[in-house]
A protein has these predicted regions:
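Canonical tetratricopeptide repeat
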Residues: 62, 78, 112, 146, ...
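TPR alpha-solenoid repeat register
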Residues: 58-60, 75, 109, 143, ...
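Short coil/linker segments at helix-helix boundaries
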Residues: 62-66, 153-198
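Short coil/turn linking the two alpha-helices of tandem helical-hairpin repeats
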Residues: 119-121, 148, 153-162, 223-227
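Conserved structural position within tetratricopeptide repeats
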Residues: 51, 98-101, 131-135, 197, ...
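Short coil turns that delineate tetratricopeptide repeat
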Residues: 54, 70, 104, 138-139, ...
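N-terminal leader/linker segments that initiate helical-solenoid repeat arrays
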Residues: 18-63, 69-74
Length: 227
């Protein structure tokens, strides 16, 4: 019985050992390719090593590479994409930040980093990143979808709190009612209008988006009520 237990344990261990050995061989070849000036080949080998054993590839990145080269940035991109695909979002974020330090206005990296931040639960930073994306590319569909929904939901929450506070007033004075209406106008200008701009752009880019159309109808109705 003990023999079979050991046998199965060895079988289970073999794939991970083989992957580690494969990654080690590939990373040795990465070093050789870099020494020979074969950057594209080195990146291809590094991608394979990352797939075989991402932990070894990560250690290689931090300990063996000159970080001041375009090739090392491409390898950081490989690690970022790999960790994001495998839902290791903390590490993915770390490598996206490596990329953004070198190229802070790269839209593709900003979008990927924003997605990662959402998965990490940092909605505020995702919003900041998507806002930067729109500043660089006003037609970015993903940023417009996220921000349109984000601004709308934030405005809805603010409006709900304002309405609840107003309902608690047994006999509101004209001054209190005026403040309530001004509060609604401020929420509309600071939230609903921004959501409207993003979602209108979504419909221009993606006319079949029923969700964007539905939210825009709700904003239009509220706008009419405020006039």
């Amino acid at each position: 019985m003990r023999i079979w237990t050991v046998f199965f344990f060895v079988l289970l261990m073999c794939p991970s050992v083989a992957e580690a050995q494969t990654a080690e061989i590939l990373l040795q070849k990465v070093t050789e390719a870099l020494s020979a000036g074969k950057a594209d080949y080195a990146v291809s080998l590094f991608r394979q090593a990352t797939a075989a054993n991402a932990e070894q590839a990560e250690i290689y990145y931090w300990t063996q590479l000159n970080k001041n080269t375009d090739t090392s940035l491409r390898m950081a991109g490989e690690l970022a994409a790999h960790f994001k695909d495998y839902r290791v979002y903390d590490k993915a974020y770390l490598f996206y930040m490596e990329l953004l330090q070198a190229h802070p206005d790269d839209v593709q990296t900003l979008v990927a980093c924003a997605e990662t931040q959402l998965m990490r639960g940092d909605e505020d930073d995702a919003r900041r990143l998507y806002e930067k994306v729109l500043g660089l590319d006003a037609d970015n569909l993903q940023a417009n979808i996220f921000l349109g929904n984000y601004y709308f939901l934030q405005a809805e929450n603010r409006k709900k709190r304002l309405e609840e506070d107003f309902k608690h007033l047994a006999s509101p004075t004209r001054m209190q009612y005026a403040r309530y209406r001004n509060g609604l106008s401020d929420i509309f200008a600071g939230g609903y209008e921004k959501a409207k701009a993003c979602l209108q752009r979504v419909l221009q880019l993606f006319p079949s988006s029923s969700e964007a159309g539905h939210i825009l109808e709700r904003i239009k109705k509220l706008e009419a009520e405020l006039k």
